[in-house]
Amino acid sequence: MEEYHRPCDEVGFNADEAHNIVKECIDGVLGGEDYNQNNINQWTASIVEQSLAHLVKLGKAYKYIVTCAVVQRSPYGFHTASSCFWDTTSDGTCTVRWENRTMNCIVNVFAIAIVL
């Protein structure tokens, strides 16, 4: 029986690649929509599930954590923060901020390298 080795040619997490993937997922779900509280659960679930599926399809040796927050746009602003204790040479994070005239969306991707 042959062993399967996941391709991992590059060292470190490619945040630009992840950013582009997540941005496309957000655009696909929220593009053209106005804020509607009744749709938030569906929208956030779709964004994290699609983002995760596309990241996994890259076939890289990472475990991913994807979070998403969608809030109604207001003059009061919206602030988030996160902190991680990990190997900065192989693990990484990417934050995507998206907005339209009625809402703001923040997606965080945390990638933790799998050491085989």
From Swiss-Prot:
Disulfide bonds: none
GO molecular function, a single term: identical protein binding
Protein name, entry field: Dynein light chain Tctex-type 3
GO cellular component: cytoplasm; cytoplasmic dynein complex; kinetochore; microtubule; nucleus
Classification lineage: Eukaryota, Metazoa, Chordata, Craniata, Vertebrata
Cellular localization per UniProt: Nucleus; Cytoplasm, Cytoskeleton; Chromosome, Centromere, Kinetochore
Gene: DYNLT3
Keywords, ordered alphabetically: Cell cycle, Cell division, Centromere, Chromosome, Cytoplasm, Cytoskeleton, Dynein, Kinetochore, Microtubule, Mitosis, Motor protein, Nitration, Nucleus, Transport
Gene3D superfamilies per record: Tctex-1
Organism: Ovis aries (Sheep)
Pfam families xref list: Tctex-1
